């Protein structure tokens, strides 16, 4: 009943109005899985390739008809008749057929959309919710937890048209008893933040990930206005709610220095920028920093890990790009202590699960993440619960492309009840 009988690829639109790949996998017995590939703005240089057409007369060159043709042609032909329950086998067929290190032949956007659609179809054929099927694929059947959200309520960097260098300022409602209550707390802080910004005459337009994108006097001012909003919402900063940042430092790394426009174009060395961040962690309860240096600055990361790694979570995104080869090297060299998991960085569900397992086995945490270009596809919610990853980054409390994931988590928590505990602060590296 789980034999693949039809595969369909199509071009749809993402949350930025750009095309992306959606795939359907149909099985015997009428079971269907459908999934769409997300797309990033600040991307690591070693990510799997997102195949775009480059035809400037169509979607400004961002069309994905070549990737869609790969789904409807060679990929479909290769997996028709195969057993959808063999996820590793299906993914291997596509990866081998593509034949490149970075999936540049078919595009990671094509392979991932089919990979996820296949998992959804297989789950349906087994009569299981997607998170339960993922737990089985992960070798951890029935082991679930609800993730602590990192809610990106102030957007800067590549995600917003403002003067803030650091790309994401996030809140984590660690004091909540459940995921649903964490979402409520996040929503309340989000609305109070709008009031705080308006009272200061600041813009409350939102960026790609649904957070506000005001012009601020400095990067520290973003933390200050969030602290004000947390207090106004009736919560205690550091106890009920902790803070996290994604520096996306590769975006302001120029000629070996970190140049911050929000700090008067000041240029920092790796060590100086590490201490700039350390000072912020002393002023505010920041418990997680992502991509605190450039992806190629491994010596700098070793220093940053030495200075901050036993106090807070240091997450590698552009640094590790969900790639087990790069992560393995990072673990061996003691670089960071956590990995951001974006399945389009590597391009298949099987490889994503391998990265999560490698991280956990090494004592690193794994933070499941959206991309800045998203769709209504909420697979990452099921991935977070099904792997018991413990943390999720899926944007702010606005834009349906972000909220779709929170709503799916609320549904899953309702279905699982006490089977999926919300562990709060304990999930964050260095905070247990």
Swiss-Prot record:
GO MF entry, a single one: phosphopyruvate hydratase activity
- Known EC number(s)? 4.2.1.11
| Domain of life, per lineage | Bacteria
Residues the record lists as binding Mg(2+): 246, 290, 317
Please list the cofactors this protein needs: Mg(2+)
Q: Where is the active site?
A: 209 (proton donor), 342 (proton acceptor)
- Pfam families of this UniProt entry? Enolase_C, Enolase_N
User: Its GO biological process terms?
Assistant: glycolytic process
Which pathway is recorded for this entry? Carbohydrate degradation; glycolysis; pyruvate from D-glyceraldehyde 3-phosphate: step 4/5
The positions annotated for binding (2R)-2-phosphoglycerate are: 167, 342, 371-372, 393
Kindly state which reaction or reactions the protein catalyses: (2R)-2-phosphoglycerate = phosphoenolpyruvate + H2O
Q: Which InterPro entries match?
A: Enolase (IPR000941), Enolase-like_C_sf (IPR036849), Enolase-like_N (IPR029017), Enolase_C (IPR020810), Enolase_CS (IPR020809), Enolase_N (IPR020811)
Presence of the UniProt keyword Lipid biosynthesis in the record: no
Query: Keywords assigned by UniProt?
Result: Cytoplasm, Glycolysis, Lyase, Magnesium, Metal-binding, Secreted
> Record's GO cellular component, any one?
phosphopyruvate hydratase complex
Location comes to:
Cytoplasm; Secreted; Cell surface
Per the similarity annotation, which family is this?
Belongs to the enolase family.
Its annotated function is as follows: Catalyzes the reversible conversion of 2-phosphoglycerate (2-PG) into phosphoenolpyruvate (PEP). It is essential for the degradation of carbohydrates via glycolysis.
Instruction: Share what the entry says about its subunit structure, partners included.
Output: Component of the RNA degradosome, a multiprotein complex involved in RNA processing and mRNA degradation.
Q: Which protein are we looking at?
A: Enolase
Q: Which gene encodes it?
A: eno
